[in-house]
Amino acid sequence: MTRTPAAPEKHNRDSASRYKSGSKISTLFAEELVERSAIAGFGRKDLVVFDNACGTGAISSALHRALGDEKTRTWKLTCGDVSEAMVEVSKQKMIEEGWQNAEVEVVDAQNTGLLSDHYTHVFSAFGKMLGTQGNGIMLTSISAFNLFPDDKAAMEECFRVLQSGGTLAVSTWCSTVWATLIQSAIASIPGDLPTPTTEDIFGLYNKNWADESRVRAQFQQAGFTDINVTSVKKEYTVPVQELAEACKISLPHITRKFWTQEQRDSYEAEVPKAVLRILEEEQRGIGLGAMKAEAIIATARKP
């Protein structure tokens, strides 16, 4: 398959560094999702994989590491995202990592236009939103199925494009340290500001993917069988400044939903300061904190 030309450079050094650091937590969950999909043990035929709402390509990258050359020499990988900017990022990663037999294209997860009964595996992990922070482009990670305006249509598309016996693997957030820190920071600021609940934050666009029972129900309603749903935690240590940066990236999406414009103008800039103050008080001069999150991992089979 013809390799795609390199994507234009869109990050300065500072923003790229912060993006790479913040993407580690998503990478850990991508590896978990790939492992739980059992794709490494698939032996019936050549793999045909769709990385749905691929974002920065974390799943496709994890797949290459897990499967190795023996399987990727003969597989077909399609990476799709509705965001042209995310497609460019994934194309660049494809070039840098030498993905085999892969293509990256703009695809609407709710109406993919892809072949029916075609893929052995469909993955849908954490989606990415682009935003600006300082002088660079920044990304925030939100569950792809929380982003879809019509999540039922997206599930129907996953079911349609899978072969009989094919596997769908999905991950969604259920708790993150950056959401908790934002909540604490807002509550600490005078002004009686609306403080969204955890369910509010992870249900910004729809609330069907915030807990295990709801996720299981979505798979059942779409017609899947052999449904496995579990929650998984990941954690690693980072400088407190990185935790504060993670909050900055997500904050505008939260305040846009739950605050008035007047509240945003008056108080939004105070939230990162409050986050850093909370972290420094908690760590008592150590300067390190825990980047931690919990995600729902779900896999199922098309009959």
Swiss-Prot record:
InterPro entries hit by this protein: Methyltranfer_dom, SAM-dependent_MTases_sf
Pfam families reported for this sequence: Methyltransf_31 (PF13847)
Single GO BP term: methylation
Keywords: Methyltransferase, S-adenosyl-L-methionine, Transferase
Cofactor(s) of this protein: S-adenosyl-L-methionine
Enzyme Commission number: 2.1.1.-
Listed GO MF terms: methyltransferase activity
Statement: the UniProt record of this protein carries the keyword S-adenosyl-L-methionine: yes
Family: Belongs to the class I-like SAM-binding methyltransferase superfamily.
Function field: Non-reducing polyketide synthase; part of the gene cluster that mediates the biosynthesis of the bicoumarin kotanin. The non-reducing polyketide synthase ktnS first catalyzes the formation of the pentaketidic 4,7-dihydroxy-5-methylcoumarin from acetyl coenzyme A and 4 malonyl coenzyme A molecules. Further O-methylation by ktnB leads to the formation of 7-demethylsiderin. Then, an oxidative phenol coupling catalyzed by the cytochrome P450 monooxygenase ktnC forms the 8,8'-dimer P-orlandin via dimerization the monomeric precursor, 7-demethylsiderin.
Record protein name field: Methyltransferase ktnA
Source organism (scientific name): Aspergillus niger (strain ATCC MYA-4892 / CBS 513.88 / FGSC A1513)
